[in-house]
UniProtKB/Swiss-Prot annotation:
Disulfide bonds join 127-237. It comes from Prochlorococcus marinus (strain MIT 9303). It is an enzyme of class 2 (transferase). This is tRNA-specific 2-thiouridylase MnmA. Pfam families: tRNA_Me_trans (PF03054), tRNA_Me_trans_C (PF20258), tRNA_Me_trans_M (PF20259).
Amino acid sequence: MQPPIPAPLKHVSRTPATPAVAKALTRLQCWPGEQRVAVGLSGGVDSSLSAALLVEAGWQVEGLTLWLMSGKGACCSDGLIDAAGICEQLKIPHHVVDSRATFQAEIVDQLVQGYQQGVTPLPCSRCNRSVKFAAMLSWAEKERQLHRVATGHYARIRHREDPEPQQALPGDSSGRHQLLRGLDQNKDQSYFLYDLSQDVLAKVIFPLGELTKAETRQEAERYGLRTAKKAESQDLCLADHYGSMKAFLDNYLPARQGEIVLQDGKVVGEHDGIEHFTIGQRKGLGVAWREPLHVVQLDATANRVIVAPRAEAGRDSCVVGAVNWISIAPPSSAIDVEVQVRYRSGPVAAQLIPIEATAEDIAADRPHRCRLTFNEEQFSITPGQAAVFYAADAVLGGGLIQQINTASS
């Protein structure tokens, strides 16, 4: 038997704090079909307000927290306590799903393996696809017969049944749900969501997609939510859990000294592990040289960090594999796109050309691959990170950077 539909929050004024909040509430109130949802609660202010807005809009809401790691931290006991407290405030049920084994196998072990191979992995997009949304939807449907989940991500989805017209995109987008950037450019998280499937997009709600972080804080305080003034966690939950990414890596990988060299092989310094470096890095190299040096390659076989002056560090082409086309069908010919190659970097113009997939990608059921040629040289194209393709604020797709090269190579 399902729990009763919770009453709207009585202590909240009926006048939303901002027009964006009013628009979000109206959209939720007018949502077609069954208004029952599981809200992923991390214990932070973003997911807390998402739950509060859904309750205010009259939805039947159940809180769901994934237990990802043991110990203290945003993903652990501290987050669980705050998530439970929010559910108590909102008078909604709270459930905890133990996902530690899946998180260890799919994220931690894969992350460590990637660093050992000399790449800089992007665990957040993999976690969204393989752990978070998979676990939430599986639990919601099997245990509570709930067919939608909501989270506090700053992104938007233009569902195909929405009354608002879909964006015109380069490529075939007919019959597809479209993933869009969040309106707050400083908090937009669409970069980490490119790998979701159409089936998942159909069942997901992002109540904060039209809000800024400041509006979220303001509205959370208006609700009196216990997490309204909670400090931001780090972008990477593992860094938050261990105190820093270096502490996480030191916990799993023993120090392995090697050389820092120029592209011609000249030794200019030493390092304690290639996993502590990333492409484009300039600070913290521990190298005294006549001009600033940038990391241009991590050679796992030779255990070397390869550096170069900025004039030699630019790259204008890369190969992207395991591509997921989310808002359009896979293109058969070249298209012009904007590309984001790091979460905190802005989009840059490039031409995308589909190329033949590797046997490894095909075996993993990820048969799409492409070459990107950038209009201007880039200095932080990093194997293991995602290259996400945009048209204006729509996410066309994305994949993992496999190879960096110049246009002539």
